Design a protein with these regions (language model features):
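Active-site rim/loop-helix segments in enzyme catalytic domains that contact anionic ligands
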Residues: 2-132, 162, 303, 311-316
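C-terminal accessory domains and tails appended to enzymatic cores
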Residues: 2-33, 169-170, 177, 192, ...
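Internal alpha/beta domain cores that form substrate/cofactor-binding pockets in large enzymes
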Residues: 66, 94, 99, 103-186, ...
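Residue-level detector of flexible, active-site-proximal loop/helix-junction positions
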Residues: 72-74, 112-114, 188, 206, ...
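Short acidic, glycine/proline-rich loop/turn micro-motifs
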Residues: 77-80, 192-196
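Short, conserved loop/turn and helix-capping segments at secondary-structure boundaries
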Residues: 83, 87, 150, 154, ...
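Amphipathic alpha-helical segments that form well-ordered structural scaffolds
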Residues: 92, 155, 159, 208-215
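Histidine- and/or cysteine-centered catalytic micro-motif in compact active-site loops
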Residues: 142, 186-187, 205, 216
Length: 318
């Protein structure tokens, strides 16, 4: 007969097998590589545009990476019907798996422009997180420009705590680690400007970043072209692969390169005398777990630099 969890003489059922399923505190002794990192964006191109360099760095070093999109992106086009856009963008996410070498790209079936922090979405994301058990989740800041981005940020922060609550979604086992949450870089200043706590030089991955962008044909060569300052007549034909790579470099690669300019002081502090051309920047959320020294050291060994600006006096309060 299975033992039951007893607290103050009350039995709480056999599913716990006599043990509290939660880890009391994630320490050095709990951390065992490879690192598991989950990039959670609103649309099936958000993690790619902002984080593909970091993702590729992790994959090359043998760590586990998954991408997640909270909606199917079916409104991201000026001509095609939504149903066709959604199918097409799902296919583009499959190309990203092969290009970046990530494990999976999970795309939720929420319509574009309709992501909300509902109970249904919170449960769905909790199960996705628990199944993978990431050490780190990367997502949008709650004050990003798109309503879907803001809702995704809220969902991640809500789910991050609930991941460790056994009676929430009890069908999905609680993982041994509550994730650290990092925010992708952005340019917004209200209610607070982005704070670059972790900086990583991704210049050596420029070709892979360009090819990852190019996987999203419906976006980079159609929908976003006017937003990037070009017309559809400027886009090379689909069979001109090198021409399209050159077009990405002049029309869209600034989405990565601009971070080096916007956060030049942080980049100079992280890489004195180096002046890297392509960097990605991340802010540590106050939600989630603080990385243990072994995780910080591992990321540093990959070329990342922690600037520690997130530390506050609360870390000294016992």
């Amino acid at each position: 007969m299975e033992s039951k969890l007893k607290i103050n003489g009350i039995e709480y059922g056999s599913r716990f097998r006599g043990e509290d399923p939660r880890v009391p505190g994630f320490t050095e002794s709990h951390f065992k590589p490879p690192l598991r990192v989950m990039f959670v964006g609103a649309h099936p191109d958000d993690p790619d545009v902002r984080c593909s360099g970091f993702a590729r760095t992790l994959v090359e070093a043998g760590h586990r990476v998954r991408f997640v999109a909270l909606c199917n992106g079916d409104k991201g086009h000026q001509f095609m019907p939504s149903e066709e856009v959604g199918r097409r963008r799902y296919g583009e996410s499959r190309k990203v798996i092969a290009t970046l070498g990530i494990e999976d790209y999970i795309v939720a079936d929420n319509p574009d422009c309709e992501v909300e922090p509902t109970l249904e979405n919170r449960r769905w994301l909790t199960r996705v997180i628990r199944e993978f058990g990431p050490h780190i989740i990367v997502t949008h800041r709650p004050n990003d420009y798109h309503c879907d981005h803001r809702a995704t940020a809220t969902l991640v922060q809500d789910a991050t705590y609930l991941v460790g609550v056994p009676l929430w979604c009890p069908d999905a086992p609680v993982p041994e680690v509550i994730p650290t949450v990092l925010f992708m870089g952005d340019r917004f200043t209200q209610p607070a400007p982005f704070r670059p706590d972790f900086v990583i030089d991704v210049s050596r991955h420029e070709d892979v970043i360009v090819d990852t962008f190019a996987c999203h044909e419906s976006q980079m060569f159609e929908w976003l072209v006017p937003e990037h300052g070009y017309s559809l007549a400027d886009v090379p034909p689909a069979d001109d692969v090198e021409g399209r790579r050159r077009f990405i470099r002049k029309s869209a690669l600034h989405l990565v390169a601009d971070y080096a300019r916007a956060f030049d002081e942080a980049v100079a502090k992280a890489y004195p005398g180096r002046n890297p051309r392509l960097v990605e920047v991340y802010e540590k959320s106050e939600y989630g777990r603080t990385p243990v020294p072994a995780e910080r050291s591992l990321l540093a060994s990959l070329g990342g630099v922690w600037l520690d600006s997130v530390q506050s006096k609360w870390t000294q309060v016992k």
